[in-house]
Amino acid sequence: MTEKTLLSRKHDRAFGHLDRNGTGFIEREDIIDLGERVLSAVGEPTSSERGAELLGAFGEVWTVLVTACDRNADDKLDAREYHIGMTWAFVQDEEGYDRIFHPAVKAVMELADTDGDGSLQAGEFRAMQLAFGTPADEIDEAFAGLDRDGSGSLTVDELLRAARQFYTSPDDRDPGNGLFGRI
């Protein structure tokens, strides 16, 4: 058996964020459920403008993935299809990341910034991470690993860079690898 690459292990973690019911598949409802968990964690109604924006962005991510990678046309993705889709749509196609995935990530980060100061404090970061399903005992470590300047906060821009590294970078030196805990 070959060892999984860093990017594959990160995509496994991301697949787990979505497959919370343990079916081994991701469906559109799973992606929308993640959006609803994020909204709930930050106290934002799904019916608000920001809530609708986030859910719409998550819906766009789903559309790109399922269109590109649902090989058997069953409207769900198994782990292999998900890995292929993430790699094709957002790693190999940087414009795809910028056009489709970045807006969804940005919407999450801006919603998590509940006081609107342009950065996430440890508590805001924790709420976002718990919504994603990051193990609670790894959240403080993730925050510290991303807080490279020791300021006690993470700017939305820093988090956007970390997310890009997490979802697209094979470089094991990137701090964004730890965005969702230990890989």
Predicted regions: what they are:
Residues 50, 96-97:
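Short, intrinsically disordered linker segments that flank or connect zinc-binding domains
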Residues 26-46, 78-92, 119-133, 156-169:
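Amphipathic regulatory helices of Ca2+-sensor modules
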Residues 2-44:
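The feature marks the first
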Residues 45-53:
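Conserved GNAT-fold acetyl-CoA-binding loop/helix
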Residues 2-6, 56-57, 99-100, 132-134:
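Short helix-capping and inter-helix turn/linker motifs at the boundaries of alpha-helical repeat units
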Residues 8-23, 52-74, 102-116, 138-156, ...:
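Primarily EF-hand calcium-binding motifs
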Residues 69-95, 104, 108:
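Hydrophobic, well-structured mid-protein blocks that either form specific transmembrane helices
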Residues 165-183:
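Acidic/histidine-enriched, glycine/proline-rich intrinsically disordered or flexible terminal extensions
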